Regions:
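Conserved NTP-donor binding/palm subdomain of two-metal-ion nucleotidyltransferases/polymerases, i.e.
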Residues: 1-122, 128-406
Length: 406
């Protein structure tokens, strides 16, 4: 393992536990300015910069830019604390209007960390029932929120400084895995919902079993496309460790096997056990689940950045993995597939395609200009995207997610 990655994972593990280990202290003594920069750049890529900044401030390695790191950490703390307060005001207003609203991921996951506001969230996800949408929209507008997406979108995006909210009427929509519709697993989630302390107050959220399964499905969704960052894995490991008494692992493994996600999940948890401080006793594994082989998964996660956003090539490679997973195109691992996806594949990024699919060539041009703006040859970038796509499809095959080859 690269020294950069070892330092990154060690500091992150300690931040999740609220400790400074002897191992981290030893590594810190040998860190020079170059290595510190590399570790912090990786932390920035994965949106865990404040967590690692705090650890470095505690360890104080040579050449540390203390003033810069302290400023970043304090700024994040203040911004995140204000966003959490705004969330509590919003959920309180929804409740007062008679709307059951469940906060998912975000604030709930942050509360698992020793210093919750150092785990940044770019937005908050709120789940409501479809029949409550008109009244919910009135509540958002009454609090000064502006709708930043089309009213017809399946997920509405609302913003009022300092809070950005994704408003959902369905957790999984039409998502299917291994031929199974996922949404029915959550049809009764409102009746099972619980109250959750997020530090400054309480919110309603999914029951622990529902929430943990949803975190895994959310990991899978991003893993299937451009890749998933380390922060999501941290959330899952902390949830598994701190909520072990409220998780029925026998039922979870059965559900995950039905969805062909048991192998991937166990390899995720194995990384948590080996690198992120997860107690193996918190996640009992049935003997029928194959032994973990998770190093390739770790490298894919480290290279991906948050939501697979580390590079344009990786973003564009998602078309290859999606097509392979749906078995619609067994020759998807080509330069053409990376450069010229279908209109339906690009609608989420270029919203004008939803009503005007004939503008698809314009979207292709926009993608190509995106490559060129980063200053590299278009063909080289497309070939690189195809290569990443093929490598990632091999990972999907390894963890039992698909059986087709490209």
């Amino acid at each position: 393992m690269k020294l950069r990655d070892l330092c990154f994972l060690t500091l992150l593990r300690d931040a999740m536990a609220g400790t400074c280990s002897t191992e981290a202290a030893t590594l810190a003594k040998s860190m020079d300015w170059t290595l510190e920069n590399q570790v912090l750049e990786l932390a920035q890529l994965h949106h865990v910069f404040p967590l690692l900044a705090q650890q470095l401030l505690l360890l104080n390695p040579p050449d540390l830019r203390r003033d810069v790191l302290r400023h970043w950490a304090m700024e994040t703390l203040a911004r995140q604390a204000m966003a959490t307060q705004a969330l509590l005001v919003l959920t309180g207003a929804l409740e007062k209007a008679g709307i059951p609203a469940l906060v998912v991921k975000g604030a709930v996951c942050r509360s698992l960390y020793p210093s919750p506001d150092l785990r940044p969230s770019s937005d908050e996800d709120i789940l409501i029932q479809p029949e409550d949408l008109p009244v919910a929209e009135q509540v958002f507008r009454s609090l000064g929120y502006c709708l930043q997406s089309s009213p017809e979108d399946s997920v509405q995006i609302w913003y009022a400084n300092p809070l950005r909210v994704e408003l959902h009427c369905s957790l999984c929509g039409s998502m299917t895995i291994a031929g199974q519709a996922v949404q029915p697993w959550f049809d009764a989630c409102f009746s099972r919902s619980i109250s959750w302390n997020v530090g400054e107050g309480t919110v309603r959220t999914l029951a622990q079993q529902d929430h943990f399964l949803y975190l895994i499905l959310h990991f899978y969704k991003h893993f299937l496309t451009g890749g998933v960052g380390i922060r999501q894995l941290c959330d899952i490991c902390l949830f598994a460790g701190k909520q072990q008494a409220n998780l029925d692992w026998s039922s979870l493994w059965t559900e995950l096997e039905t969805l062909s996600l048991a192998c991937l999940t166990w390899n995720m948890l194995d990384l948590g056990i080996r690198y992120l401080g997860l107690d193996s006793r918190a996640v009992p594994k049935p003997e029928r689940i194959p032994a973990a082989d998770s190093e390739d998964l770790l490298q894919d996660i480290l290279e991906a950045g948050v939501f697979g956003s580390s590079s344009l090539e990786r973003k564009h490679s998602s078309r290859i993995t999606l097509q392979a997973a749906s078995a619609q195109n067994r020759k998807a691992g080509t330069v053409r597939a990376a450069l010229f996806p279908s209109a339906s594949d690009l609608q989420s990024r270029y919203s004008y395609l939803q009503k005007n699919p004939w503008l698809l060539p314009a979207a292709w041009c926009a993608r190509c200009f995106g490559y060129l703006r980063e200053g590299r040859n278009l063909g080289v970038r497309a070939a690189s995207a195809a290569k990443i796509g093929r490598q990632r499809v091999a990972l999907l095959e390894k963890y039992g997610i698909l059986n087709c080859k490209i």
